[in-house]
């Protein structure tokens, strides 16, 4: 792990130095945008990632970032030291694992989690492990969280793809779902999919995706889908 103060010259002038993950930059925890402190924390986390990593180095592998993990702890701050609703916690957990990060951090006080939260965490972590070979391809899709635009993460392999989307606004927003573009599918490969909701439910997302379409995300909605190619 290289922490906050990584420098490109280390890699340039020290070829023996390797790093599995680097810090996404910014504050450990902060708030931005709409909703509860948990929702604002998620927006800040992703806005910082977009500003410091995606825009400056669009080819940098997102699975090699240290995001500062899942936070629900007595020693946290900005409202994250308080018990979260089950739905807020689930949004935080699934959005975190959808980033594909290989450095999976938990900043958690166990007594603040009930059975529902533990089950959510276990399910998402297991899903992440089972799909590691796909999630290694994770890249950014959509817009800028700082502008409260719909954004997310996509990863693709020939046998399976994964799509995560989030609306950071407190208003419904449309998203142009073009999976050939979002998955960055090579020319000639299948671009039609059967979509299975892994987290969340949205009736505007087609179960059988054939062509680009406009979907609508509800305020502060987080979605995760698996996509299986259809010949």
Predicted regions located by residue number:
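Active-site-proximal substrate-binding groove within the catalytic cores of carbohydrate-active enzymes
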Residues: 2-201, 216-224
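C-terminal beta-strand-rich structural cap/linker in extracellular carbohydrate-active enzymes
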Residues: 204-231
């Amino acid at each position: 792990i290289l922490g906050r103060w990584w420098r490109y010259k280390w890699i340039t002038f020290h070829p023996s130095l390797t790093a599995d993950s680097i810090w996404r930059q910014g504050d450990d925890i902060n708030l931005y945008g709409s909703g509860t402190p948990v929702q604002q924390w998620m927006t800040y986390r992703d806005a910082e990632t977009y500003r410091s990593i995606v825009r400056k180095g669009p080819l940098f592998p997102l699975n090699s970032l240290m995001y500062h993990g899942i936070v629900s702890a007595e020693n946290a701050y900005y409202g994250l030291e308080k018990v979260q609703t089950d739905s807020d916690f689930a949004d935080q957990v699934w959005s975190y694992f959808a980033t594909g990060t290989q450095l999976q951090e938990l900043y958690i006080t166990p007594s603040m989690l009930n059975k529902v939260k533990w089950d959510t965490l276990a399910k998402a972590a297991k899903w992440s492990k089972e799909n590691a070979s796909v999630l290694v391809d994770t890249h950014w899709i959509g817009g800028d969280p700082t502008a409260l635009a719909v954004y997310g993460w996509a990863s693709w392999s020939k046998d399976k793809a994964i799509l995560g989307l989030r609306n950071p606004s407190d208003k419904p927003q449309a998203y142009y779902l073009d999976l050939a573009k979002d998955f960055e599918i090579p020319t000639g490969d299948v671009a039609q999919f059967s979509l299975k909701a892994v987290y969340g439910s949205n009736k505007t997302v087609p179960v059988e995706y054939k062509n680009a379409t406009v979907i609508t995300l509800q305020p502060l909605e987080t979605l995760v889908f698996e996509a299986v190619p259809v010949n």
